[in-house]
Amino acid sequence: MSTFDLQPGVDFQQAGKQVLQIEREGLAQLDQYINEDFSRACEAIFRCHGKVVVMGMGKSGHIGCKIAATFASTGTPAFFVHPGEASHGDLGMITPQDIVLAISNSGESNEILTLIPVLKRQKILLICMSSNPESTMGKAADIHLCINVPQEACPLGLAPTTSTTATLVMGDALAVALLKARGFTQEDFALSHPGGALGRKLLLRISDIMHTGTEIPTVSPDASLRDALLEITRKSLGLTVICDDSMRIKGIFTDGDLRRVFDMGIDLNNAKIADVMTRGGIRVPPNILAVDALNLMESRHITALLVADGDQLLGVVHMHDMLRAGVV
């Protein structure tokens, strides 16, 4: 790294705030460019039967990657192609059903200009995003989106700062407008984010994490209280379910109920579980979202739920299962 002498009188905080002010003013100018061309771009992308192919060089390319990713995760299939690679074979990734969104602040990116005749020959719709509608790219575009800003936040006027922020925001405006047009939902978003926290919350169902079969702590109504306590200890879920031979739920007994029994002075060896159980028990269907089941647990101040179809016991889920699955 090159070394420089610290300039006298430099106020880092003031410099940072000045950048924010300049970029805020630049973004405020974008409002005038959300116009008929913007609507035409949205309509074209909405009706596109292929994908949106985003292109850009340098900093515009980095911003283009983010715009393509935002499109893809909000219901608009998209990917990024580097213009330099496109002119050496990657142009074959683009089909006549696609739309190209080309980004260049100046509108004079040589790498993109080289591709335009080929795109035109294939009748591929070209949307250009630049600061100059009269630029070569602006004139060649089927639709031009202006991202002109008064000044860069860089005091030298060289490093792309305000202009790249404006480009990113215009991309967000397109993506969100299309999201609304598609009626895109949280569930749709989760389908493309199954590995994230939101995906787990919106996709994971109780049936995916519940204990089933021999993992379920159960005893018959004729069992002794002592046998029920042994079952609670063996299965380590903090409860046992009292069921008949057909696994129909008769009641539930938890470690919290045990404290109540001790206070009552009941004989553990002679008492029947049916005499001290809580009838019913809080139940949820197997298709309920895990996050909704967790909310129910928290609202009822309990740590486990029965999973059932009516009176038929299907499984048990504990708060710890939620933690392991990353729902919390």
Curated annotation (Swiss-Prot):
Top-rank EC class of the record's enzyme: isomerase
Highest rank taxon of the organism: Bacteria
Pathway: Carbohydrate biosynthesis; 3-deoxy-D-manno-octulosonate biosynthesis; 3-deoxy-D-manno-octulosonate from D-ribulose 5-phosphate: step 1/3; Bacterial outer membrane biogenesis; lipopolysaccharide biosynthesis
EC number: 5.3.1.13
Domain CBS: 210-268, 277-328
SMART domains according to UniProt: CBS
Record key words, sorted: Carbohydrate metabolism, CBS domain, Isomerase, Lipopolysaccharide biosynthesis, Metal-binding, Repeat, Zinc
GO molecular function: arabinose-5-phosphate isomerase activity; carbohydrate derivative binding; metal ion binding
UniProt binding sites for Zn(2+): H82
Chain positions recorded as substrate binding sites: 75-76, 82, 88, 114-123, 148-150, 275
Signal peptide: none
Site (Catalytically relevant): K59, E111, E152, H193
Pfam families: CBS (PF00571), SIS (PF01380)
SIS domain segment(s): 41-184
Keyword Transferase: no
GO biological process: lipopolysaccharide biosynthetic process
Keyword Isomerase attributed: yes
Reactions this protein catalyses: D-arabinose 5-phosphate = D-ribulose 5-phosphate
Sequence similarity: Belongs to the SIS family. GutQ/KpsF subfamily.
NCBIfam families (alphabetical): kpsF, PRK10892.1
PANTHER family in alphabetical order: ARABINOSE 5-PHOSPHATE ISOMERASE KDSD, PTHR42745
Function: Involved in the biosynthesis of 3-deoxy-D-manno-octulosonate (KDO), a unique 8-carbon sugar component of lipopolysaccharides (LPSs). Catalyzes the reversible aldol-ketol isomerization between D-ribulose 5-phosphate (Ru5P) and D-arabinose 5-phosphate (A5P).
Subunit-structure text: Homotetramer.
Protein name from the UniProt record: Arabinose 5-phosphate isomerase KdsD
Organism of origin: Yersinia pestis
The organism's taxonomic lineage, starting at the top: Bacteria, Pseudomonadati, Pseudomonadota, Gammaproteobacteria, Enterobacterales
